[in-house]
Amino acid sequence: CYKKLSMSKKNSSVILKNGFKDFPDLNKIYLNFKNKIIQTRIKSFIVAISGGPDSLALAALTKALKSEKKYNFQYVLINHNIRKNSSFEAKQVKKLLKVNNINLKVLHNKIKIKNNLQSHARNLRYDLLVKYCLKKNTKSILTAHNLEDQVETFLIRLSRGSGLTGLSAMKFETKLNSKIKL
């Protein structure tokens, strides 16, 4: 469900607390999300949280679904320790989710990233998430992306000279290894 939403952290916080009743358009997105999750036939997920509005909306979606069905969602934030405020920001996100009865596990990247920051950070993030999945015996990771993320992925691939097969945007499901799906 890559519908463009005007979602601020404030709106995400309201949704976490009250559900979707104050945002009628989000009910359609929730039902679409719920159907996609049901179709996977998977009951346990790691939910990757960044603290941005997309991932807070995902936290709200999973919290609502958990209250309705028997799913196990474990919430994880990767702190890359890149910025001075990274630890403070991670604590703030953890606090926000805790107030909304969501437990957040913060994993810390200890490898210093020297170049190609975005790509290396993404690879390290997925490595940490895969290790956490294996530790928790969970085979699926949920991440939040919006339409702008899809367009950005397409444009990055285009700028790198990708051929027709590489010009797709993000897939709904990607295998990270033989056991773990994103």
Regions inferred by a protein language model and the residue ranges of each:
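Core alpha/beta nucleotide-donor-binding catalytic domains of modification enzymes
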Residues: S8-L182
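Short, Lys/Arg-enriched N-terminal segments with co-localized hydrophobic residues
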Residues: C1-S6
